[in-house]
Amino acid sequence: MDAKIKPLRAGKSADARTDFQPAELDPSEFLAAAVQPDQPRPSRAEAEAAVKTLLSYIGENTEREGLLDTPRRVVEAYDELFQGYHQCPAEVLDRTFGETAGYDDFVLVRDISFTSHCEHHVMPFYGKAHIAYTPVERVVGLSKLARLVEIFARRLQTQEHLTAQIAAAIDEVLKPRGVAVMIEAEHTCMSVRGIGKQGASTFTSRYTGMFRDNPAEQARFMSMIRNRG
């Protein structure tokens, strides 16, 4: 298959791209729970009724024995799969430790497994996240980075948005010298439905601070992710 390279838009030069800066996220996306206690929401009974409607839509008999409890089970599963809407990312990163003996290199946690759901088809995508940050005097507990991934993953997402949210939360709360996030994932909306290409992986990355400004640090981050020796 031949690739077609689109020309730059009129008035744009290739050099202009080097000045690109990523868009800033709204802090409400990563500093607080997505659902507030006083936010109006459908009742549990209404949610179960909606599941029953979908079962009827696909042609099922919702009164048969195997489906009698399915609406309840689906809503309970949603409560678990999407609990990230009720959790606060900033609180996870709030506790830090200052006993670092002057450590001044980046901290990397790789292979953080996760499962999320695509906001376009509500189908799972899953994979691994790799996170590095260069602390300023204080560090956060390593498990907190995994917990942060879990909170954002348990919401409807795109992989690009998930990557950006993780980086933005670390950058804003910890205020390190730089953050690097890479996510690799397989999307069932592409492998199970649609084009049906199993095994295809999608990679996304986001860099801030020293990682964004220094290609050598990006390269070292990537090397440490890939080096399994």
From Swiss-Prot:
Record's keyword annotation contains Metal-binding: yes
Gene Ontology BP annotations: one-carbon metabolic process; tetrahydrobiopterin biosynthetic process; tetrahydrofolate biosynthetic process
Pathway connected to this protein: Cofactor biosynthesis; 7,8-dihydroneopterin triphosphate biosynthesis; 7,8-dihydroneopterin triphosphate from GTP: step 1/1
Enzyme class: hydrolase
Gene Ontology CC: cytoplasm
Protein family according to the UniProt entry: Belongs to the GTP cyclohydrolase I family.
Complex and partners: Toroid-shaped homodecamer, composed of two pentamers of five dimers.
NCBIfam families for this protein: folE, PRK09347.1-2, PRK09347.1-3
UniProt protein name: GTP cyclohydrolase 1
Lineage: Bacteria, Pseudomonadati, Pseudomonadota, Alphaproteobacteria, Hyphomicrobiales
Gene that encodes the chain: folE
